[in-house]
Swiss-Prot record:
Enzyme Commission no: 6.2.1.64
Description of activity control: Binding of TP53BP2 to the regulatory subunit NAE1 decreases activity.
Summary of subunit composition and partner proteins: Heterodimer of UBA3 and NAE1. Interacts with NEDD8, UBE2F and UBE2M. Binds ESR1 and ESR2 with bound steroid ligand. Interacts with TBATA.
Record GO cellular component, one term: protein-containing complex
Gene giving rise to this polypeptide: Uba3
Protein name: NEDD8-activating enzyme E1 catalytic subunit
Keywords: Acetylation, ATP-binding, Cell cycle, Ligase, Nucleotide-binding, Ubl conjugation pathway
Protein function: Catalytic subunit of the dimeric UBA3-NAE1 E1 enzyme. E1 activates NEDD8 by first adenylating its C-terminal glycine residue with ATP, thereafter linking this residue to the side chain of the catalytic cysteine, yielding a NEDD8-UBA3 thioester and free AMP. E1 finally transfers NEDD8 to the catalytic cysteine of UBE2M. Down-regulates steroid receptor activity. Necessary for cell cycle progression.
UniProt organism field: Mus musculus
Amino acid sequence: MADGEEPEKKRRRIEELLAEKMAVDGGCGDTGDWEGRWNHVKKFLERSGPFTHPDFEPSTESLQFLLDTCKVLVIGAGGLGCELLKNLALSGFRQIHVIDMDTIDVSNLNRQFLFRPKDVGRPKAEVAAEFLNDRVPNCNVVPHFNKIQDFNDTFYRQFHIIVCGLDSIIARRWINGMLISLLNYEDGVLDPSSIVPLIDGGTEGFKGNARVILPGMTACIECTLELYPPQVNFPMCTIASMPRLPEHCIEYVRMLQWPKEQPFGDGVPLDGDDPEHIQWIFQKSIERASQYNIRGVTYRLTQGVVKRIIPAVASTNAVIAAVCATEVFKIATSAYIPLNNYLVFNDVDGLYTYTFEAERKENCPACSQLPQNIQFSPSAKLQEVLDYLTNSASLQMKSPAITATLEGKNRTLYLQSVTSIEERTRPNLSKTLKELGLVDGQELAVADVTTPQTVLFKLHFT
């Protein structure tokens, strides 16, 4: 038999053995459940123990809810997402949706084990769903090759639990805002049935974290925004005149030489996924590094700097995904008390974990339900307000659009996401708040890419 036929022969043999096992054990027809398949889960759900929830009553209903009803959304099908999907599918979750806007790159294959070389270039969500649907009997994984912003509140409301394996703080903040917008209040009291729990995991090298967020009840992403480190940027003066690191050379080529030379035609943007673009940046970076006797510029480093790649270690992904999947299981079954509410993991020097309770901020712009108070002089310019919204550690907005109600009409003071409106409202940035007609106690509505909700600010003059 040819070597190419050997894997197919093994696959058929495995299917035959599985069919024989189901027949011997008393298989359940076309349901895909053979006797003993869920014994490992039943041990947690059909008997009590010292760590079970005080209100938990062992029964078969929890397992049936897991198998037949519970619907989970996984956001991200990368290194963490692959581990999450595998863990959830093997834990009994059968109604799984996965969202990912990326396609598979060769560099993903060393740790994102649901993908194979033949899958390079295909959407991660679709390939991950195909793999699990084929490998795990009766598991139904529905892929969405989209951005999370492509879906409305009706889509997110259908899920019992949402778990994230993202590498983007903006995306985290957006889904956090979406889940908060789903909350219902009656006479100021939160309706618990409107809560969609969010389990969030993140990794960087040998470090990671996992957290449980119950929107409206526990600290949300915005409550602890200061915990996220700012993106590493190098001073332009250093990049241009005094480079000392390989990264300085790469950033110089990316930020200055590429726009100036436009090597692939006028207006062609740099694409971090295009090997030709990366190769050009790599060669030019080597040339600049040689001028300053700097060593260490490699193709891989070039790609990492251009794409802002976060270093990934497979074992860290496995640990954090296991924590997240365990929390999903605990919340879905109510068998155990969930994490309260933030866990950090460090595997740099030995093994270290620490759990603490992140506290809600009374004036959180996302979950407090209160307008945010800001103080400025009447002579302050609108540009100063814009700078505050983008530079404040507790806000960190990216492209805020500011509107206000003036003389009974809703007026856009500044909006930069639409070119024509940005040009029309740009002169407002140099005007004072008094010149714009704003008064003490004025409410400003601010929209931003970091949240699907409009954030209200109350302006107080000093």
